[in-house]
Regions:
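Short phosphate-binding/catalytic loops that engage adenosine nucleotides
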Residues: 278
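Mg2+-dependent prenyl diphosphate-binding active-site environment of isoprenoid biosynthetic enzymes
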Residues: 25, 29-270, 281-291
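N-terminal amphipathic/basic leader segments beginning at the initiator methionine
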Residues: 1-26
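Non-transmembrane, amphipathic alpha-helical segments
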Residues: 5, 9, 42, 174-177, ...
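Short cytosolic juxtamembrane segments of multi-pass membrane proteins
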Residues: 294-295
Length: 295
């Protein structure tokens, strides 16, 4: 896919994701205003919008007219809630997120905690309401996202990650962290988009596995950038992993092995998408670019 065509499609998907976020979530002045202002502050902070884009693109790959806006917004709500909570002093204690003060710095810790709490049920309300006319689809989307965001994946990965190096530096534990903390929430968007696009069960699984491989690769790139980029590039403090005693792939296996694993995982993700019967050209290009990003 040539660069101009990719950029045009990517920009279009970003715009669709941003519009959905603005129109499908409560306004900042909804009572209680401070809570909703904190929610909107974090939702509208920008970022890559990677999860919504993956979901929208996957749906369109199988059915160009598919409407995945509610699912895309639900995914960003879950992702944003996890970032708000990750930044709290009791977790990563990060003052900067997406290039501006973290939610608890812009408001206060209690409001940030509650804003994250509120985004979680909002995500599932979006799935229930947005696909009410397709109850089986709604059920499957809720199940997919709940599993990805639950105690064995997203929250479980964060729990293990909080233990840092002190909890033991073994490869199995690291894989659990990578799969849970990052990969699960890149696997779910592709699977959910495929479900909305009425893909076959085989293709839904290909998308799920592609997201899993791409998600682990995404985290490994993040780990490398944490040691080499600057705060302006990343939009968050650099060197935080080392500072917080975090357990990372480069720390365990070294930089050359990390770079090789990124290439292997990216190829695996592309192969899964190539096996799908939908038009996954854009998704394959996006995942390839994710592996070589500098922010």
């Amino acid at each position: 896919m040539d660069a101009a065509r990719f950029q045009s499609q990517h920009d279009s998907l970003i715009q669709a994701a941003e519009l959905a976020l603005r129109t499908l979530t409560p306004a900042a002045d909804t009572r209680p205003a401070r809570l909703h202002a904190a929610m909107r502050y974090s939702l509208e902070a920008g970022g890559k919008r990677l999860r919504p884009v993956l979901c929208l693109a996957a749906a369109q790959a199988f059915r160009p007219a598919a409407d995945a806006r509610h699912a895309a917004t639900a995914l960003e709500c879950i992702h944003t809630y996890s970032l708000i909570h990750d930044d709290l002093p009791c977790m990563d204690n990060s003052d900067l997120r997406r290039g501006r003060p973290s939610c608890h710095k812009a408001f206060d810790e209690a409001t940030a905690l509650l804003a994250g709490d509120a985004l979680l049920p909002l995500a599932f309300a979006l799935l229930a309401q947005g696909y009410a006319d397709r109850p089986e689809l709604s059920r499957r989307l809720v199940a997919e996202l709940a599993h990805a965001a639950g105690s064995t994946l997203l929250v479980g990965g964060q729990t293990e990650d909080m233990g840092g190096l002190a909890a033991g530096a073994d490869a199995d534990r690291l894989e659990f962290i990578l799969l849970g903390k990052t990969a699960a929430m890149l696997s779910a968007p592709l699977a959910m988009g495929a479900l909305i696009g009425e893909a076959s069960e085989t293709d839904v699984e290909h998308c799920r596995l592609a997201g899993r491989a791409a998600g682990i690769a995404f985290q490994l790139v993040d780990d490398l950038l944490d040691g080499s980029a600057n705060a302006a590039q990343l939009g968050k403090p650099v060197g935080a992993d080392a500072q917080n005693g975090k357990f990372t792939y480069p720390g365990l296996h070294g930089i050359p092995a990390t770079q090789a694993r990124i290439q292997q995982l990216t190829a695996e993700a592309v192969d899964h998408l190539s096996a799908c019967r939908g038009d996954t050209t854009f998704l394959r290009a996006l995942i390839t670019r994710m592996a070589s990003r500098d922010r």
